[in-house]
Amino acid sequence: MKYILHRKGYQVLKAYDGMQALKMLETETVHLLILDVMMPRLDGIRATLKIRETNSIPIIILSAKSEDADKILGLNIGADDYMTKPFNPLELVARVKSQLRRYTQLGGNVSSTQETIYEVGGLRINDDLKEVTVDGEMVRLTPIEYNILLLLMKNQGRVFSINQIYESIWNEDAIGADNTVAVHIRHIREKIEINPKEPRYLKVVWGVGYKIEKL
């Protein structure tokens, strides 16, 4: 894995266990993490939970477990992507490239003097600064969560199906997309809604998809 990423031009730092990965994140400039579920000392699940307390860096989890429940768990704890072993190394490279592109866009420099802002009620996205606020309070979103919310905010009132959301954000065919999108939608609601079970902004249209409600 390290070899193929090097061949594709990426600089790779290797940690031998989860604790070393956390220390490396504090001392090195890291733009993406690939964590194995079975890492010693601190496994990939617990490492992801710890990282998500303070950092929105893209995380790809690797696991030999292919069941939907394991994938949902990985996404539930804040991972941006989940791959089951064995996998094609070129697919990993493609996913790394995709996650880094989103992360770079999310943290990109502002060059325009006119801000691009989308608002509904107390929910506000400044797409130049890549900032999300609710009633003036800053909200921390992962790159995937931000891009989903931005897609819906740009098209307030329009219903997007799960497949449309997946294909727009992941840029790949929506195979098995239901659980993946649903988990990220739930995370967004937990961060922007006062009561996620009775959302004001991010609504579901049963049997169709999701939308940002016009207020």
What do the PLM-derived regions correspond to, one by one?
Residues L49, E53, P58-E119:
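Basic, amphipathic DNA-recognition helix from helix-turn-helix-like DNA-binding domains
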Residues S98-V159, N163:
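Short, Lys/Arg-enriched segments at the junction into DNA-binding effector domains
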Residues E115, R140, I185, R189-L215:
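DNA-binding patch around the recognition helix
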Residues E28-I34:
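Active-site beta3 strand of CheY-like receiver
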Residues Y16-Q20, D43-R46, D70:
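Acidic catalytic/metal-coordinating carboxylates
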Residues M39:
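Receiver (REC) domain active-site loop signature in two-component systems and cognate sites
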Residues K2-R7:
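Charged docking surfaces used in two-component/phosphorelay signaling
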Residues G9-Y16, M24:
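Short hydrophobic/Thr-rich beta-strand motif most characteristic of the beta2 strand and flanking loop
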